[in-house]
Design a protein with these regions (language model features):
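Residue-level recognition of the N-termini of beta-strands and the immediately preceding loop/turn
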Residues: 8, 54-56
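Redox-cofactor binding/interface segments in oxidoreductases and associated redox assembly factors
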Residues: 33, 58-59, 112
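Compositionally biased, intrinsically disordered/low-complexity regions enriched for serine, proline
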Residues: 23, 58-59, 183-185
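SAM cofactor-binding core of SAM-dependent methyltransferases
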Residues: 1-37
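Hydrophobic alpha-helix-in-membranes signature
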Residues: 28, 60-61, 106
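Class I S-adenosyl-L-methionine
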Residues: 41-54, 64-188
Length: 188
């Protein structure tokens, strides 16, 4: 909103988060589905746009599976408490559900965010699978750990950002894999 964008639709299934969205964005459609049950076509319909029209699809799947403060791989392949009223199976796989939805939406740009721990140790395999997953659906993607304080926020918080650009858009604007990282992630 501060950058001048419009939020066309939201997917959230935790009641307290839905209530917050409704308070902050009363005119934005909210799809209260588990992302495993959501399709990109559901999202497009709620946003009242066609496949390929969306400029930016933004998603931040839960990060507890990759947080260095959590159980990490000891908690993988298990059902976890996600909120006071929700449990989720294999929370570490939700980024791939986001990619599945993104395949149907075909936004020009996709942004995903998670904890820096997704780049460390055995979680690095997930990082690589996410980058490759975007490639499998027609995007060139890069992921990088950034410190929020370097970009003007009042907190020193390390987060991993994935940016994926649809291949035809990259061609149209003259971005290629060799210069993509420096264009997307300029030095602060």
């Amino acid at each position: 909103k501060l950058a001048g964008g419009n939020i066309l639709a939201v997917n959230e299934f935790v009641e307290s988060a839905i209530d917050t969205y409704k308070s902050n964005y009363p005119n934005t459609p909210i799809l209260p589905n588990d992302i495993k049950e959501l399709t990109g076509h559901d999202l497009l319909k709620a946003a009242e746009i066609q496949q390929g029209e969306l400029d930016i699809l933004d998603g931040s799947p839960p990060c507890s599976a990759f947080s260095i403060a959590g159980k990490r791989e000891k908690g993988w392949d298990k059902t976890k408490k996600y909120s006071d009223d929700k449990q989720v199976d294999n929370i570490e796989d939700l980024f791939f559900e986001f990619i599945r939805v993104a395949k149907d939406v075909q936004a020009k740009v996709i942004i995903g965010e998670n904890v820096a721990g997704i780049t460390m140790g055995t979680a690095r395999e997930y990082f690589n699978r996410i980058v490759n997953g975007f490639g499998d659906i027609g995007y060139e993607a890069v992921g990088k750990v950034l410190n929020a304080a370097d970009y003007g926020t009042p907190q020193a918080r390390q987060r991993c950002f994935f940016v994926a650009i649809r291949n035809d858009v990259m061609d149209d604007v003259g971005i290629n894999f060799m210069n993509m990282d420096s264009i997307i992630y300029p030095e602060p």
